A protein has these predicted regions:
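N-terminal metal-binding scaffold of metallo-dependent hydrolase/deaminase domains
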Residues: 1-41
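Active-site metal-binding motif and surrounding structural segment of the metallo-beta-lactamase
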Residues: 38-54
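Metal-associated gating/positioning segment near the N- to mid-region
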Residues: 52-117
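Histidine-centered divalent metal-coordination motifs
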Residues: 62-66, 180, 239
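Short catalytic-loop micro-motif centered on adjacent basic/acidic residues
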Residues: 93, 123-126, 234-239
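Histidine/acidic-residue-rich, glycine-tolerant segments that coordinate divalent metal ions
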Residues: 97-108, 112-227, 244
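Hard-cation-handling environments
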Residues: 241, 250-261
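Single conserved hydrophobic/aromatic residue that forms the stacking wall/gate
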Residues: 259-270
């Protein structure tokens, strides 16, 4: 059993920043020490981290590595190398690749591929569709991190828009549901409205806030929250983008605070 002492570091952890050291026993942190306190037991190796920050391994629970099928952009080998270099030691990958991770076979193949390519810890979301709800109860919940649910259309065309399918997903998933929430009916209506007024060709990006509007976001998010309350499902709503939606979570934990705050005003300036 090898013990390594990393000392003279600036430790960043749980909202605190302090000078100190860490003792690692094989691959497990066994002591976190403040100031010049020395380890309780002598160590086999020492690393002077003067001038460096020392943080726990970061867990990124929402990545798109585009593997399989879109590996001209990136793959699990390249992205986990970048992750490790930046201190990210675990990731959870989304299912809108090619083929989509919407069957048990595709999910198993992705785990097998990751075992050969990944140099950090990994898990994968299973993609829900209108037609695969019968597979949810067959998922290995010790290894699958959650079910990705597109309640609005996005990359990969995995929209789930049948209320009976949504109810079944919320009642039978048995693991975390990570939902992309935009009401597709409102989006279609807004798209046609913009096209009728400004023309069919290449709708300008400036119309994005009108098409994927506050109402579209709120309507879908409120439905997701309602279904979660009715079924007791564990729900995460991803990339919330409106103040109105935040009202749905006033008494709920927020695990990722706002990290970017552009508005339609900023789009006009860009």
């Amino acid at each position: 059993m090898k013990r390594t002492w990393i000392y003279n570091a600036t430790i960043v952890n749980e909202g605190l920043k302090f000078a100190g050291s860490v003792v690692v026993e094989d691959d497990t942190i066994c002591e976190v020490l403040q100031g010049e306190v020395r380890p309780s037991v002598p160590c086999d190796a020492e690393i002077d981290a003067r001038g460096c920050y020392l943080i726990p391994g970061v867990i990124d629970d929402h990545v798109h590595f585009r593997d399989p099928g879109l590996t001209h952009k990136a793959d699990m080998a390249s992205e986990t190398a970048a992750a490790a270099a930046g201190g990210v030691t675990s990731f959870m990958d989304m299912p809108n690749c090619n083929p989509q991770t919407t069957t048990l076979e595709a999910l198993e193949n992705k785990f097998a591929d990751a075992a050969n390519k990944c140099i950090v810890n990994y898990s994968f979301y299973f993609g829900a569709t209108n037609n695969n709800t019968e597979l949810l109860q067959q998922l290995d919940k010790k290894h699958v991190c959650g079910v990705k649910l597109f309640m609005g259309a996005s990359t990969g065309n995995m929209l789930v828009d049948r209320i009976e399918s949504l109810r079944k997903i919320f009642s039978e998933a048995g693991i975390l549901i990570a939902a992309h929430c935009e009401d597709q009916t409102i989006i279609r209506w807004n798209t046609e409205l913009v096209k009728s007024k400004y023309g069919e060709e290449d709708v300008d990006i400036l119309f994005h806030p009108r098409i994927r509007s506050e109402e579209a976001c709120w309507r879908s998010s409120s439905l997701a929250v309602q279904l979660a309350k009715e079924t007791g499902a564990r729900l995460h709503i991803l990339h919330v983008s409106t103040a109105r939606e935040l009202e749905l979570f006033e008494d709920k934990p927020i695990s990722c605070l706002l990290y970017t705050s552009p508005s339609p005003r900023d789009m006009r300036r860009s």
